[in-house]
Amino acid sequence: MSLSREKVLESIAQIVHDETGIDKGSVQLDKAFVDDLDIDSISMMTIVVNAEEKYGIEIPDDKVRELRTVGDAVDFIIAAKA
């Protein structure tokens, strides 16, 4: 099953909203988790765990630090599921 960027973005937006209350429409591919969405490290780890559970993948800690934008996370998930 191939995942579209739009579907993964939609699910990441829902996960971010559930954890932080940020409006799903604000969660866009070019938005940085910390700089644009003001997500702290604890919330980011919860978001990562929820994404791992949803997609059945593991995101190593060193990779989490590389996921600066929502688009980075979407692309990582798509690549991990390919």
UniProtKB/Swiss-Prot annotation:
GO terms for molecular function: acyl binding; acyl carrier activity. Pathway: Lipid metabolism; fatty acid biosynthesis. It is found in: Cytoplasm. One of its GO terms (biological process) is lipid A biosynthetic process. Gene3D superfamilies: ACP-like. The modification O-(pantetheine 4'-phosphoryl)serine is found at residue 41. InterPro entries: ACP, ACP-like_sf, PP-bd_ACP. Keywords: Cytoplasm, Fatty acid biosynthesis, Fatty acid metabolism, Lipid biosynthesis, Lipid metabolism, Phosphopantetheine, Phosphoprotein. Residues 3-81 form the Carrier domain. Belongs to the acyl carrier protein (ACP) family. Carrier of the growing fatty acid chain in fatty acid biosynthesis. This is Acyl carrier protein.
